[in-house]
Curated annotation (Swiss-Prot):
Belongs to the PsbT family. InterPro entries: PSII_PsbT, PSII_PsbT_sf. One of its GO terms (biological process) is photosynthesis. The lineage of its organism: Eukaryota, Viridiplantae, Streptophyta, Embryophyta, Tracheophyta. The keyword Thylakoid applies. It comes from Houttuynia cordata (Chameleon plant). One of its GO terms (cellular component) is photosystem II reaction center. Keywords: Chloroplast, Membrane, Photosynthesis, Photosystem II, Plastid, Thylakoid, Transmembrane, Transmembrane helix. This is Photosystem II reaction center protein T. PSII is composed of 1 copy each of membrane proteins PsbA, PsbB, PsbC, PsbD, PsbE, PsbF, PsbH, PsbI, PsbJ, PsbK, PsbL, PsbM, PsbT, PsbY, PsbZ, Psb30/Ycf12, at least 3 peripheral proteins of the oxygen-evolving complex and a large number of cofactors. It forms dimeric complexes. It is found in: Plastid, Chloroplast thylakoid membrane. PANTHER family: PHOTOSYSTEM II REACTION CENTER PROTEIN T, PTHR36411. It comes from the Eukaryota. It holds the Pfam family PsbT.
């Protein structure tokens, strides 16, 4: 149960950081690279 909570916290933190960086810079090159 502890491992599940720790994994969830890690994933959520990484997601928030990724979104913050993605929204901070204009995703023009990123969108072209992803699609």
């Amino acid at each position: 149960m502890e491992a599940l909570v720790y994994t969830f916290l890690l994933v959520s933190t990484l997601g928030i950081i990724f979104f913050a960086i993605f929204f901070r810079e204009p995703p023009r090159i990123s969108t072209k690279k992803m699609k």
